[in-house]
């Protein structure tokens, strides 16, 4: 990690004057310090976390091993198409605002405004959620220490990591992600050996045929698991945000899109298959999907059956790493999003100021403060206010994915209509126009069907709690449109000019 000089925290007050027009690719003082290995691990680390280590057991319990596999495979296909769309735009136009900038330029300023604030709030509240989870995890070892002590300690750690430079963030995320990857690889190898009876008697395929397996609950159960699977994959879009500080985005972004996704899918599909084979879906421990129930993580259960005495302690440490990784990435992503909006006039302009190391310091401190307030809300509200905050941000990732598909659809059409050659693009999404259309449709189905049971039962409070994020997004979009009286950018007028990386930036 690089060590900042004494002036590292000196704020550069020239940022705004050095930024181009908001209708052009933005030149900022962000430093392109993320290497290819950073980009690879940011993409991997964004998708491997508590969704795999903890919540995967609940998906098998709900839909059976076959249903869980089907759900993750379908959501994985959707994410592949979305990441191909994002990769095409990010390699051509690598800016820290990513899809917020694309939404503003390829759809309308009001859509970009809503996308940006939606994404910023999502990750700011995610930081708060990870602070809450960190206290639960640490209580495994030190139950007498108040959770707020750990929350403050980890918030300070994450703030310092993000305050130094993008390279320090990338280095921290590289090692966080590497720990998670090593854990999954060991799990896959050990689980495979167990299936073949190396450590104990093999269960064979009996857990795939017991009861109404492999598709417990039928089609509706698979639909209900889609949302859990979708949440598990959220964070893969971080590679688009990080492209704005990649040292070689034309090469590193396509490489991350092409290779990392398949590794992630291998990890998820392999882990679900092993858990479903070794643990029956009727095991009540699979239903416990809270970070505080680490002894019942499906990974812990499998390692214990292998004879690892300290399985719970080991997995607790890994999950703490996953929590810190998510908080680290959340603070980074939301900071860059707020910074980008400030430069385009969609947030207070002082959030565009950066330090001499290229860190949007005011945007980062504001995001840290919101994360801290979210944690306080969880402490004092007996989870009521905090739960609603989580629900508001819960749909944000899916809304962003919808926006990515819509932006790519319009970008490619405008690019071709303006007479440009697709050969000039550093990376071309291979399944256009089928890809973004299918991804948009699938994502919309998952978003609207996330709590269909409450809708059918007429449970209005649960419906409002589950879907509140969607009307808030639409109100922000409509409100900005009414105030600014903007319009949808036509294909002929759309600015699809790419971003050229100068030697000074690289």
Task: Put a short name on every predicted segment.
Residues 135, 148-203, 234, 257-265, ...:
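Membrane-interface loop-to-helix entry segments
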Residues 30-31, 55-150, 154, 160, ...:
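Extracellular loop-to-transmembrane helix junctions
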Residues 175-176, 351-359, 401-464, 495:
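C-terminal membrane-solvent junction of multi-pass transporters and transport-like membrane proteins
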Residues 95, 118-133, 228-246, 309-349, ...:
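Membrane-helix boundary/coupling elements in multi-pass transport proteins
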Residues 15, 100-106, 110, 131-151, ...:
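Helix-loop-helix connectors at the membrane interface of multi-pass transporters/channels
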Residues 101, 108, 140, 225, ...:
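TM-loop-TM module centered on a large, flexible mid-protein loop between adjacent transmembrane helices
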Residues 23-30, 69, 142, 146, ...:
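Helix-loop-helix junctions that connect adjacent transmembrane segments
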Residues 1-57, 61-66, 80, 84, ...:
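Membrane-interface "cap" regions at the ends of multi-pass membrane proteins
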């Amino acid at each position: 990690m690089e060590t900042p000089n004494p002036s590292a925290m000196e704020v550069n007050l020239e940022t705004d004057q050095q930024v181009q027009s908001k209708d052009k690719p933005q030149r900022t003082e962000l430093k392109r310090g993320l290497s290819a290995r950073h980009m690879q691990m940011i993409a991997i680390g964004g998708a491997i976390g508590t969704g795999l280590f903890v919540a995967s057991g609940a998906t098998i319990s709900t839909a059976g091993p076959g249903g869980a596999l089907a759900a993750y495979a379908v959501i994985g296909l959707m994410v592949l198409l979305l990441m191909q769309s994002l990769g095409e735009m990010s390699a051509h136009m690598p800016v820290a605002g990513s899809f917020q900038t694309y939404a503003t330029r390829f759809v309308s300023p009001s859509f970009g405004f809503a996308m940006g604030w939606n994404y910023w709030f999502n990750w700011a509240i995610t930081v708060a959620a990870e602070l809450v989870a960190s206290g639960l995890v640490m209580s495994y070892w030190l139950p007498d220490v108040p959770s707020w002590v750990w929350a403050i300690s980890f918030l300070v750690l994450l703030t310092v990591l993000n305050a130094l430079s993008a390279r320090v963030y990338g280095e921290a995320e590289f090692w966080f992600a590497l720990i998670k990857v090593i854990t999954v690889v060991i799990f896959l190898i050990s689980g495979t050996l167990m299936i073949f009876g190396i450590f104990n008697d093999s269960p064979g395929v009996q857990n795939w045929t017991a009861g109404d397996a492999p598709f417990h609950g039928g089609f509706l159960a698979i639909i209900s698991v889609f949302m859990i699977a979708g949440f598990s994959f959220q964070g893969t879009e971080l590679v688009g945000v990080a492209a704005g500080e990649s040292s070689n985005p034309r090469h590193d972004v396509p490489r991350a899109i092409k290779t990392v996704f398949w590794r992630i899918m291998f990890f998820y599909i392999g882990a679900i298959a092993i858990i479903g084979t070794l643990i029956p879906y009727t095991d009540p421990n699979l239903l416990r999907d809270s970070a505080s129930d680490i002894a019942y993580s499906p990974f812990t259960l499998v390692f214990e059956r292998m004879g690892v005495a300290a399985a719970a302690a080991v997995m607790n440490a890994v999950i703490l790493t996953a929590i810190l990784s998510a908080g680290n990435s959340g603070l980074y992503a939301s900071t860059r999003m707020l910074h980008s909006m400030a430069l385009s006039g969609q947030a207070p302009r002082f959030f565009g100021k950066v330090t001499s190391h290229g860190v949007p310091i005011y945007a980062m401190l504001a995001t840290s403060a919101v994360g801290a307030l979210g944690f306080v809300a969880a402490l004092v509200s007996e989870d009521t206010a905090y739960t609603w905050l989580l629900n508001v941000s819960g749909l944000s990732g899916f809304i962003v994915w919808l926006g990515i598909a819509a932006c790519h659809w319009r970008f490619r059409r405008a690019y071709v209509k303006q007479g440009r050659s697709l050969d000039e693009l550093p990376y071309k999404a291979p399944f256009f126009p089928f890809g973004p259309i299918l991804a948009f449709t699938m994502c919309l189905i998952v978003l609207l069907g996330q709590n269909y049971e409450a809708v059918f039962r007429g449970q209005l409070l649960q419906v409002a709690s589950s879907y509140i994020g969607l009307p808030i997004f639409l109100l922000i979009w409509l409100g900005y449109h009414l105030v600014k009286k903007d319009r949808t950018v036509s294909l002929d007028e759309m600015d699809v000019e790419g971003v050229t990386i100068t030697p000074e930036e690289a």
